[in-house]
């Protein structure tokens, strides 16, 4: 163990603690400090993982899937390092290892579950060698950062080929992800849902409309949402692969339930998209060689924190906070909200900071007209781009109120005695809004 590694771990832990005292998250700063002192600290610490390293990539669902995977491995009795907060660029990945290490620089972990931003795989995969990659989906996201989705796919393909023995656990219902897994030559297994579950009412922009092999328009027998579904190419024969972990008898009413490998999985969550998150975590655990006997028990105890369907109780109001950062994710959020038939109020917070992407034209690809139900009492818009959000709603004849300050918006709704409040935010609004809700929850 190099003395520089020990110093880097100590400095990072102190940095993280100071940031928390200042009311900041501090995770990425801890990683940045550690890298500055010891540039190869990620190689040093990741090499101490005794068994296997998972990485989780994809546009939507990374944090929830990664945290479920971690909890599932822990339920099997394993010690796991995980970037629970969703800090998924290089500094955040480094922070997961340094904050999980002892002050001596020793790491006591059987497994690592690491969520990695797709573009950051170029920096992470050159420092660690993953054994498994879980790929959730590939949707359009942050156009000014990623550009067209082909750029993201090219980055992932380049990195996957650098680790040819890494096994990929891929969403077979996504033509883009499935093509990538097939094309790269890595060993892979698939998960998916082979029969339609819900009526697809949205007019979504579908990214995987054309075959990546030959360019022909794909034919779908059904869609689940966005481009996820049962597809085939009429020209070259590319099609949805055989599914290894197939969710059948799927229910998404008051809770999620489905059967996979003759095992009934039940979770007290909402949102059809969560079927995929749960199924991906299950497939990861099974692929690693576990029987997943404790999977349902884990789901009963699992708390989806960090603003992913996170629940709060504030002065009699039930509050749900969720991240919505691109058209596919936002449409699924709207579907989950409208699945709740009780009267509700909604707050939408949209920022355009660097991590969000400055280009917010994606708002025009979200089906906000689905918010036109009778059970919505009010919609309030907030955040840096609240005016743009209000204009977008106006174009589909959805009235809204504007409140620049997020805390004021939340206090007003709770003060008015609303019973159910949904707060939908994009990325940089998430941490601050979560802090506000936790503070309000703690008030007498």
Model-predicted regions and their roles:
Residues 194-256, 268:
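Cys/His-rich short segments
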Residues 423-444:
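Glycine/aspartate-rich loop-and-adjacent alpha/beta segment that forms the canonical ThDP
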Residues 203-209, 269-280, 305-307:
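Short glycine/threonine-rich catalytic loop with a Thr-x-Gly-x-Asp
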Residues 238, 251-253, 284-320, 324:
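Gly/charged, well-structured mid-domain segments that form the phosphate/adenylate-handling core
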Residues 115, 136, 169, 277, ...:
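Residue-level signal for inorganic ion chemistry
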Residues 127-137, 228-242, 269-300:
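A conserved, hydrophobic alpha-helical segment in the catalytic core
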Residues 3-192, 200-202, 206-210:
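Phosphate-binding loop of NTP-binding sites
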Residues 305, 323-402, 440-443:
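Active-site beta-alpha connecting loops in nucleotide-dependent enzymes
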